[in-house]
Amino acid sequence: MDLPVDEWKSYLLKKWASLPKSVQDTISTAETLSDIFLPSSSLLQPEDEMFLKELSSSYSVEKDNDAPLFYREEGNRKFQEKEYTDAAVLYSKGVSHSRPNTEDISLCYANRSAALFHLGQYEACLKDIVEAGMHGYPERLQPKMMVRKTECLVNLGRLQEARQTISDLESSLTAKPTLVLSSYQILQRNVQHLKIKIQEKETLPEPIPAALTNAFEDIALGEENTQISGASLSVSLCTHPLKGRHLVATKDILPGELLVKEDAFVSVLIPGEMPRPHHCLENKWDTRVTSGDLYCHRCLKHTLATVPCGSCSYAKYCSQECMQQAWDLYHSTECSLGGLLLTLGVFCHVALRMTLLARFEDVDRVVRMLCDEVGSTDTCLPESKNLVKAFDYTSQGESEEKSKIGEPPIPGCNVNGKYGSNYNAIFSLLPHTEKHSPEHRFICAISVSALCRQLKADSVQAQTLKSPKLKAVTPGLCADLTVWGAAMLRHMLQLQCNAQAITSICHTGSNESIITNSRQIRLATGIFPVVSLLNHSCRPNTSVSFTGTVATVRAAQRIAKGQEILHCYGPHESRMGVAERQQRLSSQYFFDCRCGACHAETLRAAAAPRWEAFCCKTCRALMQGNDVLSCSNESCTNSVSRDQLVSRLQDLQQQVCMAQKLLRTGKPEQAIQQLLRCREAAESFLSAEHTVLGEIEDGLAQAHATLGNWLKSAAHVQKSLQVVETRHGPSSVEIGHELFKLAQVLFNGLAVPEALSAIWKAERILLVHCGPESEEVRELREMRSCLLDSSFVPVGPLV
């Protein structure tokens, strides 16, 4: 996903193994980017490019004239099954493969409008109706579309427009009575029904505008930090010989305080599951729903009404504005490279986009500093002592003068000492060139070389054909492949340590269930220069959340003045043990973690955390040991082999998965019976706070909620809460999500005092971690408003 597809990696590893040792040594011992890039690039042969071209053709993003009909029929099948979301996505795939101003695209837009109507997305439905008309929607089908348009307008309260649409429809039917009698009669009944509906709406009082609290709350930082763009005045940028650049608190900070709000300098949406290779005969077209089908490829906004790129079938956007911005900034170059970029991976794609978004003359100037001084490690390896000289390319003379009269500027800062979210800061992020394996450097360098050659070929073709399509690839940019390639290679190496996973909270649950499970999904890979200043801790004092491409960093606890502000890079103490955390951080980020959590765990005796622990079948005390586990209760002599307990746990997990499948397929009663058997088995050898017991209780809560047994569901959520709290802590975002679920159950069960209490607890925690713009916080506030409404009269909880 981040790196090239396995076939290309394997191919290059074989090529690396076949190289003479002298060539391997040249690349392995290279100290500059140009010393890595130039020898590697010279090794890229025509047969290598042909192999990569064949691989890329398997992930083609060209429009297929036969695809719209297939996707429309698949969408129709889902529509008949009332799976309207899946239907909308399939119609969108049809739109993406359609040519403008064809019946194919107009029918796909029209059908998608029907799916959006059933999902209550009336504004999006109206836009699709307009698009269908613009692309030549057949006149014979227009009356049906006008009825749908009227229904949308009525539901939106736009009654004058609804009346005009009805009038236009009646005039059209009178002027061209082409419908068969039965269809005409059905249409007339629909028209009369809509007229009555409009009259009823007109007698209702004006709707009250949505409360301001339901709108997106401004989370501006207030007064601007003059040292760091996008940061609050509560933080300051410092340097340290061991820590490097890092952020510290300038005052005492309270939980929930906003510290950094930064838009990604670059982000690339992750395709999710890779598209099936087109040589797979069993499925020529992919019907799977991935993140690439649900989110705007520029701003990452969730949308079912995607706007397609006019030239490829892959890129999709939330609006014409986003599509045009993407085209102007980078997609005009990337569009024809779609299959190649999918093959080379997200990191290569991000590296290309980072360079495209920079001012090209700056890129040339920066990387020429590296390439012109092939023998100098001072400018090519920013880890070296002449750090400032390597970075301050914006005004080198002024910087040298400044360093004579005082402290040198912090790397990435401009001549005024400000660190911004710009290419200068991006370039200052460390690539750790010497720490990457020789094989990894070779794979990256060859991949970038192949991309550069294709860029040059596209540029020559564009000039020959005088095509504006690839105008972003300027002749100057492709004139020197060393400059272009060295910049992208640097960025590709930077990304292993500096890329940020942009995530979103995904709510899942069966169609019948009103309560939802929350899980974090990775949407995109982004680069955030300011967020990258945060050092890691396995027990961080901040929470990072995302709204589209904007990262928000909040204090997760009290942070004292002078204390370092820390972020978790992924390996968190509540998710994995110290040994696994240390291994992951060392292999990906090249450092040995010495945070408080790692230090405390190393000092403790090696014992499994309670959420992974086994218990004694006799006295329920925790078991301890390595290959053979003994009861921790001194008066109990019970012992058992670890392998035996692990085998039992694996069998139990399979049984839980079977129960979850029953729940997903609409069989809650059977799921309950299966889960109760699982719970009985689990309690005989697992600790009361074991994660699997939490999953069982969560499944029972879902099943009872599906059946409307709200109080029983709430009781199981309470037990699941105990497991989550043991693992993640009482103030964690995970507890916030679980309390949100409890609030939903109690709200639906009309248990007013209990629901209000759960809402208050959930909101208090989620505000700290996610802020007031969180969807869950908004829903909690809506539930509270409803419960406190004087007109709300509970009829007693449903059992």
From Swiss-Prot:
Catalysis: reaction(s): L-lysyl-[protein] + S-adenosyl-L-methionine = N(6)-methyl-L-lysyl-[protein] + S-adenosyl-L-homocysteine + H(+)
Zinc finger region(s), MYND-type: 296-335
EC top class named in words: transferase
GO cellular component terms attached to this protein's record: cytoplasm; nucleus
Protein name according to UniProt: Protein-lysine N-methyltransferase SMYD4
InterPro entries associated with the record: SET-MYND_domain_protein, SET_dom, SET_dom_sf, SMYD4_SET, TPR-like_helical_dom_sf, Znf_MYND
Disulfide bonds: none
Single GO BP term: methylation
EC number: 2.1.1.-
Subunit record text: Interacts (via MYND-type zinc finger) with HDAC1.
Residues annotated for Zn(2+) 2 binding in this entry: C309, C312, H331, C335
The family this protein is said to belong to: Belongs to the class V-like SAM-binding methyltransferase superfamily.
Task performed by this protein: Protein-lysine N-methyltransferase. Monomethylates PRMT5, modulating its transcriptional activity. May also act as a histone methyltransferase. Plays a critical role in cardiac development. Acts as a key epigenetic regulator of gene expression during cardiac development via its dual activities as a methyltransferase and negative regulator of HDAC1.
Outcome reported for the amino acid change (mutating D458A): In strain: Czech II
Entry's localization field: Nucleus; Cytoplasm
Keywords: Cytoplasm, Metal-binding, Methyltransferase, Nucleus, S-adenosyl-L-methionine, Transferase, Zinc, Zinc-finger
